[in-house]
């Protein structure tokens, strides 16, 4: 199912967050459109995780706001953001290992309080859409790393989000599974979803992003396409390194 692209969907405006008097996020601004993949990168201690968690709704900013489709969602809890169309995939494992693939998806569908026939149709649709129909009866603990990640993304799509936030989607999986995850993210983008991801795997992230932001010292150091980022002297000095190549 393709989604209509109505321009800017998610706007992060002047986010500020301090801990013990130290400002760890200092006036961060970002924009993400539907139908594009945006990366949030930076060295350890840059403030990117804190920024990402404020967008997700895990943390609340001291100042600034987060606008979703023209609506201020800064104070909304995660579950209310989900109802508004924002999906989230945590870095931590989010599947039930002893349930089958289809049971894992059905468990999320049941929280939507839909008629059984509608849930069953949606389950079949998701299995086909994410190309895991052949795994439907397989226990989750028997899945490969790539299959598990595909199931986790499928569960995040149950609520039909317009936007999805991915926390370290390439972490802890082998190169084949990384390529598979990249393919899924590309397919979601082509269907019109807006995607914001943060990951320590810089090369894998830049390979699929339309636009990325690099943070340092709590601020946005530079933003742009991968070509802009890898050719920026400051980005190389502080984060990428002089020998970085795509």
PLM features per residue range, with description:
Residues 41-43:
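The feature captures the beta-strand-to-loop junction immediately N-terminal to the Walker
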Residues 56:
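Helix-to-loop junction immediately C-terminal to a conserved catalytic motif
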Residues 117-135, 183-186:
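Conserved ABC ATPase "signature" region
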Residues 139-143, 147:
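Conserved ABC ATPase signature
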Residues 160:
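Conserved catalytic motifs of ABC-family nucleotide-binding domains
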Residues 164-168:
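Catalytic Walker B motif of ABC-type/P-loop ATPase nucleotide-binding domains
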């Amino acid at each position: 199912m393709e989604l209509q692209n109505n321009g800017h969907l998610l706007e992060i405006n002047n986010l500020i967050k301090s801990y013990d008097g130290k400002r760890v996020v200092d006036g961060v601004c970002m924009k993400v459109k539907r139908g594009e993949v945006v990366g949030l990168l930076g060295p350890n201690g840059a403030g990117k995780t804190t920024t990402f968690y404020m967008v997700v709704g895990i943390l609340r900013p001291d100042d600034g706001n987060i606008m979703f489709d023209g609506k201020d969602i800064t104070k909304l809890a995660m579950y209310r953001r989900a109802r508004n169309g924002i999906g989230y995939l945590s870095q931590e494992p989010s599947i039930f290992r002893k349930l089958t693939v289809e049971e894992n998806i059905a468990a999320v569908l049941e929280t939507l309080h839909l008629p059984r026939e509608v849930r069953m149709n949606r389950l079949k649709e998701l299995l086909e859409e994410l190309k895991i129909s052949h795994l439907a009866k397989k226990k989750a603990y028997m899945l490969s790393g790539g299959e598990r990640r595909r199931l986790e993304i499928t569960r995040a799509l149950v609520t039909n989000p317009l936007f999805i936030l991915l926390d370290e989607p390439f972490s802890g999986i082998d190169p084949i599974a990384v390529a598979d995850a990249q393919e899924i993210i590309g397919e979601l983008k082509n269907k019109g979803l807006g995607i914001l991801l943060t990951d320590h795997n810089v090369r894998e992230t830049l390979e699929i992003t339309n636009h990325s932001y690099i943070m340092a010292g709590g601020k946005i150091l530079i933003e742009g396409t991968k070509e802009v980022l890898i050719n920026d002297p400051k980005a190389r000095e502080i984060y990428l390194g002089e020998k970085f190549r795509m």
